[in-house]
């Protein structure tokens, strides 16, 4: 686990749920207010009872926490019952990502260069620990990243990195085709982009909203599985879709509260024609 523990998970979760409760009340969103209150309840009496009476059946592979249950992850348009680590607030999809990348790639090798857009603090700290503080860089419009940057107009040179991590970001980006083209550009030939977005499995085609949807945390579209895959391949990538259950035992999935959402590995071909890059 990281040498420096990631702290204040309770405080960050409480702040997030309190803000979501206030937003829901202002928007007269009854279900959202109820979900936020349920999340806050896990920080109070229920958390103390769980700690005292229940065995350690769950553990976080990011920070080393162990306990009886994970906390809910709530926000506009979603309520995930057991998702957030009580200590570091890392959610299930990043715990899953850490295991999958460790098993299926050399992403965490200190020799491999990684660029991540829109990092979360817990996973960023974990990456820096695993990579011995080397060859990891993050950027975003928000303050938690290592430097500011725009996914649709990155300042990095062509062929700059071995891996590019873009997790639950493209659904917020109006020009997602341009963003994928930029990711393709900065990856070295043979490099891989690790991508994930919320998928609506009932859709056959991606739905564009035309503007940010407040009830979906500002998403500008709803992807279908085939639609997302088609956009990745249209950018020039070779696509491998990997389900965590293909690699990880059911008992480990339960222990670490892992996500079952597929992860999209988009590989830049070793030989790339100039026309394909435009």
Give, region by region, the residue ranges found by the protein language model.
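Conserved N-terminal segment of class I S-adenosyl-L-methionine
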Residues: 4-157, 243, 250-278
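S-adenosyl-L-methionine-dependent methyltransferase catalytic module, highlighting the catalytic core
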Residues: 45-58, 62, 174-183, 188, ...
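Aromatic-residue hotspot detector
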Residues: 68-71, 161, 212, 235-237
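Hydrophobic beta-strand segment of the Class I
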Residues: 156, 161-165
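Short catalytic micro-motifs in class I SAM-dependent methyltransferases
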Residues: 167-172
